[in-house]
Amino acid sequence: MSDVEIMAGIMRDRILNLLKEGKRIDGRSFEEYRDIEIKTGFIEKAEGSAWVRLGGTRVLVGIKVDVGEPFPDLPDRGVMTTNVELVPLASPTFEPGPPDERAIELARVIDRGIRESQAVELEKLVIVPGKLVRVVFIDVHVLDHDGNLFDATGLAAMAALMTTKIPKVEYNEETGEIIKLDEYEPLPVKHVPIPVTFAKIGSSIIVDPNLDEETVMDSRLTITTDETGHISAVQKGEGGSFKLEEVMYAIDTALKKADELRKILLEAVGSAS
């Protein structure tokens, strides 16, 4: 057995013993989030951007809006795409190169939560139906990884989208030219989906797992809900399982915690406007 495996076993035993006593390794309650800090307007060249600190986890999101063609099966909708970069300096487990499974999963969960809640009104991003639409790029950069990238990234993505300003445009039918005007308007955002992540360790379920807790968790569950209570994304990770009653508990708790996180987000976005 390697030194890493021995240390992981010791850490798991310590965390399990604390959980049996109703405690967590960092002193939080089972449903308590770490400190959250949200700042917007971090990237000058981007249409929108936000930096989020969740405990020791730090994420930067930039929004770029361009003009392109719609998807053939969605001619009356703008396009939105999410990309994640796990910066090697953020964690010794992150390596340079193409996105790995963790980056792909993170991008899909964030994209699905935003898309399925219809947070961004893509129908309002059409310039010429079937020909030209706005394309929204959500670029995520994980700067420090101390656990729960899903919730930190979800908050950063929404903060960036909600503070995005895009130039108004005019289309010249004769020349086919797109003219950008000096007048700007906010990106049309009508819902605020928030992901809430749970870790199951032994028989205990906790929210917002830190890196130590993620290292020893048996299973992970992320539930994204908007302000109406609509569930727009559910993602299970790791090899363990959740019982039906545990899933129902997670849904109820996700709705409650999402409301709390949404208030923090709206306050941060409001102070930036």
From Swiss-Prot:
Cross-referenced Gene3D superfamilies: GHMP Kinase, N-terminal domain
Pfam families the UniProt entry points to: RNase_PH (PF01138), RNase_PH_C (PF03725)
Gene Ontology process terms (BP): rRNA catabolic process
Alphabetical UniProt keywords: Cytoplasm, Exosome
InterPro entries cross-referenced by the UniProt entry: ExoRNase_PH_dom1, ExoRNase_PH_dom2, ExoRNase_PH_dom2_sf, Exosome_comp_Rrp42_subfam, PNPase/RNase_PH_dom_sf, Ribosomal_Su5_D2-typ_SF, Rrp42_archaea
Locations listed in the record: Cytoplasm
The keyword Cytoplasm is assigned to this record: yes
Entries under SUPFAM superfamilies matching the protein: Ribonuclease PH domain 2-like, Ribosomal protein S5 domain 2-like
GO annotations of cellular component type: cytoplasmic exosome (RNase complex)
One MF annotation (Gene Ontology) recorded for this entry: mRNA 3'-UTR AU-rich region binding
Function per UniProt: Non-catalytic component of the exosome, which is a complex involved in RNA degradation. Contributes to the structuring of the Rrp41 active site.
Subunit and interaction comment: Component of the archaeal exosome complex. Forms a hexameric ring-like arrangement composed of 3 Rrp41-Rrp42 heterodimers. The hexameric ring associates with a trimer of Rrp4 and/or Csl4 subunits.
HAMAP family reported in the protein's UniProt record: Exosome_Rrp42
Family: Belongs to the RNase PH family. Rrp42 subfamily.
Protein known as: Exosome complex component Rrp42
